[in-house]
Swiss-Prot record:
Keyword Kinase among record annotations: no
Annotated gene: psd
Function (record text): Catalyzes the formation of phosphatidylethanolamine (PtdEtn) from phosphatidylserine (PtdSer).
Membrane topology value: Peripheral membrane protein
Record site: Cleavage (non-hydrolytic): 186-187
A cellular component annotation (GO) from this entry: plasma membrane
Organism: Geobacter sulfurreducens (strain ATCC 51573 / DSM 12127 / PCA)
NCBIfam families xref list: PRK05305.1-2, PRK05305.2-5
Protein name, as recorded: Phosphatidylserine decarboxylase proenzyme
Amino acid sequence: MRNENTPIAVEGYPFIAIAGVLTLILAAVSWHAPVVWAGTAFFLTVTLFVAFFFRNPERITPGNENAVVAPADGVVIYLGPAREEHLGVETTKISIFMSVFNVHINRAPVSGTVLDTFYVKGKFLDVRDDRATFENEQAGLVIETARGLRLAVVQVAGLIARRIVCYAGKGDRLTRGGRYGLIRFGSRLDIYLPTTTEVKVALGEKTVAGETVLGILP
């Protein structure tokens, strides 16, 4: 499983290269046609924004092995009971909304083994709409911890973010706080925890992937 620690996620390289080349071409043309400077400035801004979007910062994960860390940067937009079909039980669901300004690298919420993966084709509704959980395109992992506890984490594509990237596969071993995927240009992460988890976040709270503790497993 890939787990790059480059300052910018490799998935961003093609976008940065295209925007960068266009910037250089327009910059060269602008020496002879000053009016083109506006286009040069525009594509330079785009290049910088794309690099900013795909930034891949290091994170310091809490030492408590029972702590479930946020899989994504963003804001908690849902917190409550929910049944997750791949787990087959009632769970505590926490949903995190990622705007285009958040880091979009996704991190493993716990250490454990990937028991199953799933991908569901679907719509591209605004991910702040709870229907997105059931109707949008999504990819998920079922993870089992060393103590036999199971949880699921689901990447949900959105109105703008229509490209889910997941490095993890069935049988892979995840390390809490380790990178396992990303979603391009804003989206949502749903995490389904055992109902006995001691929740440590509230609606509207900001999260930092790999650092914010969502809850403590029993």
